[in-house]
């Protein structure tokens, strides 16, 4: 199949977004960081009454808390990114890639028809999807095509 065509017809659901791990706005940064570590994720959705009100990412933790010397007891609401851009699970992948690139986003909440969070889409999932569309010959090329490997990869 043609990548350009697939980017228009394949939806976000095809990317198998990660589960929407959540914290409440009043939970501490320490609690959020512990959950991120436990679940091995780069972000958490901050939800109130079943709706996304913010997103708390590794970047938020590093820049707004640790680098700023703020206490880990702060509520997540004080350092989260409020009202993040959200994508619908049926939205075409191509449109989502464009939004992520334009906004510089690495994670986006995925919502259903009722606006409830159903997942988180990461750049990593997008990269895996794109790699599926290239032959192994292209993916295994050396960074400099003039370099000829001395042995087959994995030998």
Feature names for model-found ranges:
Residues 1-155:
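Tandem CBS (Cystathionine beta-synthase) repeat/Bateman regulatory domains
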């Amino acid at each position: 199949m043609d990548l350009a065509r697939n980017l228009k017809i394949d939806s976000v659901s095809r990317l198998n977004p990660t589960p929407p791990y959540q914290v409440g706005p009043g939970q501490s940064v320490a609690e959020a960081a512990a959950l991120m570590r436990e679940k091995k994720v780069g972000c958490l959705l901050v939800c109130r009454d079943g709706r996304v009100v913010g997103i708390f990412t590794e970047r938020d933790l590093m820049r707004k808390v640790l680098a700023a010397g703020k206490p880990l007891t702060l509520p997540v609401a004080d350092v989260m990114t409020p009202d993040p851009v959200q994508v619908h699970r049926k939205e075409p992948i191509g449109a989502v890639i464009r939004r992520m690139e334009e906004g510089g986003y690495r994670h986006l909440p995925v919502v259903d028809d009722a606006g409830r969070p159903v997942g988180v889409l990461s750049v990593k999932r997008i990269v895996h999807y794109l790699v599926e569309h290239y032959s192994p010959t292209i993916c295994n090329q050396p960074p400099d095509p003039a370099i000829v490997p001395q042995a087959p990869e994995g030998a």
